[in-house]
Amino acid sequence: MMYCENFSNAGVSLVIVSNGKAVTEIFRGSTPEELPDSITTEASGQLKEYFDKCRKSFDFPLELSCSAGATPFRLRVWEALCGIPYGETVTYGELASAVGCVGGARAVGGAVGANPILIAVPCHRVVAKDNIGGFSAGLDLKRLLLEIERIKY
């Protein structure tokens, strides 16, 4: 069974999805039919603390492998994203090297853009070598997240 809960803070609307054991998605938008569980409620509380600048990491359970777009390569990239510390960034090229795909910045960019769990899997911390780069949930949200973490871009 799938559970979902709307989250809204700082003008940002997100949907948190759980499989009853772990968060499987956080995406921008809203759903008219909420069915929260303890996992989505915990994630919502932690996201609120993050947006209020009171939390730098998340400890609710995540499940990346059940995403419809999960491939071994994407999973490797998504797991590497989890290692980027709060308040720091890496470039697409640096991330490509970190996952053993030297010269694969574009491939890594595709995997980053397919990340199913926004914010908790911090794809917003990946930037281009000479600019902010892209963001599947909109550059306005990426800028806000970088500002929350006091990252200059």
Give the residues covered by each predicted segment:
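Short Lys/Arg-enriched helix C-cap and helix-to-coil transition segments
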Residues: 119-126
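Active-site and channel-lining beta-strand-loop segments
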Residues: 14, 126-128
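…primarily DNA-binding HTH/wHTH and HhH modules…
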Residues: 130-153
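C-terminal charged interaction modules
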Residues: 92-96, 111, 118
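Basic nucleic-acid-binding alpha-helical/helix-turn surface characteristic of O6-alkylguanine DNA
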Residues: 1-102, 152-153
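Regulatory, non-catalytic segments
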Residues: 103-117
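Pre-recognition alpha-helix immediately N-terminal to the DNA-recognition helix
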Residues: 76-80, 107, 144
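A short acidic, helix-capping loop that chelates divalent metal ions and anchors anionic groups
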Residues: 34, 128-131
